[in-house]
């Protein structure tokens, strides 16, 4: 006889497109409302209602179970077969054979593919969190300590990550009777089949919580804001990934925390071009300064400036190298600050300037015009 299907959405009082947050809120409200201790005069009905709420939440809070429920209208219980005039009898057999055994029916008889491994609940590591930070060239000189703030899932303080309401304890799983396995016997067109699989409701443990944690809703994790200081080593490259062990999300079922992965972005400095541990700075001087010599102010990456003497007769595109004024390399030794000198030649001259230059050209024996 076909088992009457339960409408889990109706039990929790949520629409079919409800979000996980809406499902969790509804569950928290209903378990408080229908807790058997609150209904001593009608405890049996309250216990039944309480179990239905727990069962509905177990399915709808699990994306995989919810997807199966939305598609087939059941989780872990197979429908009976009915022959129809449209020939759907065989379609049902082929489809539900795959649901039961996790294999195509022809694979079973002809061995085309290996059996898929059954899903089990187990301790799993939490997810990693990626976080981008921006650093300046001055941060790359000696390294830096940069404060960051981000959200992550932490172990629920109320249940310690178990997802079970404190003192509620566990009970035998009603789906498998506490064995952790579901045995199924089927008669079909091809013969008599017996299969055994892991119970989806308890994940093979044979136990389920009597009541889920009121703070985390059974997930064992709560969202929290975290503030910490990240150490940036000297002269990191743009796009460098720094891994902080245990800085990510809390694990599942007692699993370890994931990591915090810091992605370093070096903020471009319009004054310099970076070339390994060297920095390149361009300076433009007047042609008279190149001829007569001058002193120019050169900025430093850590802040402040230094004075660079340009000797008389400096040619265009002359390169000066300031030793040890660049960025530190992996061994802690600083590179150089390379100064490229560009000479600007005026496109037009005043009458007086031209006269002076013509007289100078005549004295030097330079042909002009």
From Swiss-Prot:
Family from the record: Belongs to the DnaJ family.
Annotated GO biological process: chaperone cofactor-dependent protein refolding; DNA replication; protein refolding; response to heat
Record HAMAP family: DnaJ
A molecular-function term among this protein's GO annotations: zinc ion binding
Keywords: Chaperone, Cytoplasm, DNA replication, Metal-binding, Repeat, Stress response, Zinc, Zinc-finger
Name the record gives this protein: Chaperone protein DnaJ
Cofactor(s) listed: Zn(2+)
One Pfam family from the record: DnaJ
Cofactor binding: number and manner: Binds 2 Zn(2+) ions per monomer.
């Amino acid at each position: 006889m076909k088992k009457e299907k339960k409408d889990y959405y109706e039990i929790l009082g949520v629409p079919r497109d409800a979000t996980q947050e809406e499902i969790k809120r509804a569950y928290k409200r209903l378990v408080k409302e229908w807790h058997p201790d609150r209904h001593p005069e009608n405890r049996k009905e309250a216990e039944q209602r309480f179990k239905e709420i727990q069962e509905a939440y177990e399915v709808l809070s699990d994306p995989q179970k919810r997807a199966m429920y939305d598609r087939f209208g059941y989780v872990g219980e197979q429908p009976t077969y009915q022959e129809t005039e449209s020939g759907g009898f065989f379609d049902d057999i082929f489809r539900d054979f795959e649901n039961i055994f996790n294999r195509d029916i022809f694979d079973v008889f002809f061995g085309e593919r290996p059996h898929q491994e059954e899903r089990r609940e187990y301790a799993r590591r939490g997810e990693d969190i990626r976080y981008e930070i921006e650093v300046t060239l001055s941060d790359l000189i000696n390294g830096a300590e940069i404060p960051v703030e981000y959200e992550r899932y932490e172990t629920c303080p109320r249940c310690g990550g178990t997802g079970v309401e404190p003192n509620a304890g566990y009970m035998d799983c009603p789906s498998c009777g506490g064995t952790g396995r579901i045995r199924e016997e089927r008669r079909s067109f091809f013969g008599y089949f017996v299969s055994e699989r892991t119970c989806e409701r308890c994940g093979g443990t044979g136990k389920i919580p009597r009541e889920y944690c009121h703070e985390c809703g059974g997930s064992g994790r709560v969202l929290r804001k975290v503030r910490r200081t990240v150490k940036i080593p000297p002269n990191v490259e743009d796009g460098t990934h720094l891994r902080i062990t245990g800085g990510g999300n809390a694990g599942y079922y007692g699993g370890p925390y994931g990591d915090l992965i810091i992605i370093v972005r070096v903020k471009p400095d319009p004054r310099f071009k970076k070339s390994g541990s060297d920095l390149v700075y361009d300076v433009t001087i007047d042609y008279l300064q190149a001829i007569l010599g001058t002193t120019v102010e050169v900025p430093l990456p850590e802040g402040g400036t230094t004075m660079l003497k340009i000797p008389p007769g400096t040619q265009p595109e002359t390169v000066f190298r300031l030793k040890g004024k660049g960025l530190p390399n992996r061994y802690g030794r600083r590179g150089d600050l390379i100064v490229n000198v560009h000479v600007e030649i005026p496109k037009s001259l005043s009458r007086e300037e031209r006269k002076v230059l013509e007289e100078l050209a005549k004295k030097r024996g330079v042909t002009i015009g």
